[in-house]
């Protein structure tokens, strides 16, 4: 902000200058505050399930200090940071319980949502424990939901975000492909792995389309996770963990910092 030094010997000039400064101050006071708060919405891929270092006050939402929203906020120091993403969240949960911090002062919103609506957890359980035909059938059911029902649910969430945070830049974060193909992978056939990856692509396509329709940016993490899928030499995803089943198929801390954070940095 410029500083003005008033030099004058005539009272009329002093008064005129004072009036000018008063007008300028009034104009400045009328300007809205900058929108530079950050709100992180979504499901377990945003809250950081699988990354560890969970914030105790987040309870079952399992928000991690190693999750990409937390890492981004630590690096960029937004004026405010509200972390409402929650493990297990569906679109309805975002609408009912996560949008409170959004306002005209929100400058950035990130969100990953849709996987739970499409039945991701049940699909993966079916593919791991049941036959190839059962796996493919369950994937087909999930894809049909993604085509027929999910777009409307995403539109409801995205419209609500725009209404509550009209000045925000919104980044819709996608999901990785889960398996490296062409390698030996215990427990899952190549056919199952291929179908699961295609289902992830299918979901990402719909997410990107609906994001674009609302003027949002889509953050595609499939490229950053290439070479770090399950059955690769250095996976950034947890495989099935029977001792902590909730972390299965979720990004590790390295997946959050190396797979998700660069995408958010580039899109924000």
Swiss-Prot record:
GO terms for biological process, alphabetical: triglyceride catabolic process
Question: Which branch of life, at top level?
Answer: Bacteria
Looking up Gene3D superfamilies in the UniProt record yields: SGNH hydrolase
Task: Tell me the leader sequence span.
Answer: 1-29
Q: Does the keyword Signal apply?
A: yes
- Biophysicochemical property: pH dependence: Optimum pH is 8.5. Shows high stability over a broad range of pH 4-9.5 (80-100% of enzyme activity). Becomes unstable at pH over 10, where the activity drops to 34% at pH 10.5 and to 8% at pH 11.
Entry-linked Pfam families: Lipase_GDSL_2 (PF13472)
Q: What regulates this protein's activity?
A: Strongly inhibited by Ag(+). The cations Ca(2+), Mg(2+), Co(2+) and Cu(2+) do not significantly reduce the lipolytic activity of SCO1725. Is also inhibited by DTT in vitro, but not by EDTA or by the reagent masking SH-groups, p-hydroxymercuribenzoate (pHMB). Is resistant to PMSF inhibition, except in the presence of Ca(2+). Is also strongly inhibited by 3,4-dichloroisocoumarin (DCI), another inhibitor of serine hydrolases. Addition of tetrahydrofuran and 1,4-dioxane significantly increases (2- and 4- fold, respectively) hydrolytic activity of lipase towards p-nitrophenyl caprylate.
Q: Which reaction does it catalyse?
A: a triacylglycerol + H2O = a diacylglycerol + a fatty acid + H(+)
Predominantly, its location class is: secreted
EC no. given is 3.1.1.3, 3.1.1.-
Q: Which residues form the active site?
A: 44 (nucleophile), 250
What keywords is this UniProt entry annotated with? Disulfide bond, Hydrolase, Lipid degradation, Lipid metabolism, Secreted, Serine esterase, Signal
Which cysteines pair up through disulfides? They are 61-86, 127-135, 185-231
Temperature effect, per record, is: Optimum temperature is 20-30 degrees Celsius (DOI=10.1016/j.enzmictec.2008.01.009). The His-tagged protein shows a higher optimum temperature of 55 degrees Celsius, and a thermal denaturation midpoint (Tm) of 66.63 degrees Celsius. Is stable when incubated for 30 minutes at temperatures in the range of 30-70 degrees Celsius at pH 7 (DOI=10.1016/j.enzmictec.2008.01.009).
Alphabetized GO MF terms = carboxylesterase activity; triacylglycerol lipase activity
Q: Name one GO cellular component term.
A: extracellular region
SUPFAM superfamilies in the record: SGNH hydrolase (SSF52266)
Q: Which family does it belong to?
A: Belongs to the 'GDSL' lipolytic enzyme family.
Q: What does this protein do?
A: Catalyzes the hydrolysis of fatty acid esters with a preference for mid-length acyl chain (C10-C16). Is able to hydrolyze the triacylglycerol triolein and mixed triacylglycerols from a wide range of natural oils; better activity is obtained with corn-, wheat germ- and olive oil that have higher content of linoleic and/or oleic acid (C18:2; C18:1, cis). Tween detergents are also substrates for this enzyme. Displays arylesterase activity towards p-nitrophenyl alkanoate esters and alpha- and beta-naphthyl esters.
Give the record's subunit note: Monomer.
Q: Write down what this protein is called.
A: Lipase 1
Query: Which organism's genome codes for this protein?
Result: Streptomyces coelicolor (strain ATCC BAA-471 / A3(2) / M145)
């Amino acid at each position: 902000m410029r500083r003005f030094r008033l030099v004058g010997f005539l009272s009329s000039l002093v008064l005129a200058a004072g009036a000018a400064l008063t007008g300028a101050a009034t104009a400045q006071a009328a300007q809205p505050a900058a929108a530079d708060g950050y709100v992180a919405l979504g499901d377990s891929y945003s809250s950081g399930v699988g990354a560890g270092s969970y914030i105790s006050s987040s309870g079952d939402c399992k928000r991690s200090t190693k999750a990409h929203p937390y890492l981004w906020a630590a690096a960029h120091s937004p004026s405010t940071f509200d972390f409402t993403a929650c493990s297990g969240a569906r679109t309805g949960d975002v609408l009912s319980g996560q949008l409170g911090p959004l306002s005209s002062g929100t400058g950035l919103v990130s969100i990953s949502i849709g996987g739970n609506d499409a039945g991701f957890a049940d699909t993966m359980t079916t593919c791991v424990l049941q036959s190839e035909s059962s796996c493919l059938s369950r994937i087909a059911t999930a894809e049909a939901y993604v085509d027929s029902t999910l777009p409307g649910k995403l539109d409801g969430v995205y419209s609500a975000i725009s209404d509550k945070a009209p000045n925000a830049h919104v980044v819709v974060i996608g999901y990785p492909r889960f398996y490296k193909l062409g390698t030996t992978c215990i427990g899952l056939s190549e056919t199952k792995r291929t179908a699961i990856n295609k289902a992830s692509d299918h979901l990402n396509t719909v997410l990107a389309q609906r994001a674009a329709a609302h003027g949002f940016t889509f953050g595609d993490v499939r490229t950053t996770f290439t070479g770090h899928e399950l059955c690769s030499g250095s996976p950034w995803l947890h495989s099935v963990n029977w001792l902590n089943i909730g972390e299965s198929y979720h990004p590790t801390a390295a997946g959050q910092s190396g797979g998700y954070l660069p995408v958010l940095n580039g899109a924000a």
